[in-house]
Amino acid sequence: MKSEIQIVKEEIDKIEQIVEALRQVKEYVWNSVNTEINIITEIFMRLIEKAQIIIDEGGEFPIDIVLQQIKNFNEALNMKDEILMADTLQYEIVNTMYVYLELLEEK
């Protein structure tokens, strides 16, 4: 069974491949995006749960930024905008997954 850290690292690799395909406007790219939606959503849900624990324990976490990134991802998906999706994945989703990795590795 894969660890949460391994799952997130593998997803980051997949997203980076999708970003490259989006920038090259490959035919199959939206199928790849659709395939990864559930995994991205699951990772972000676990991140939000972890963030809530941090907040409940008196810590700080920019959960509003994470929620905005999810909204941006959904907007790009609904618009089928390759540039917006590539930017959202590369500069928002992947960066947030790296933050989540740091949280997981602190355990």
Model-derived features: where do they sit?
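C-terminal-biased regions
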Residues: M1-K107
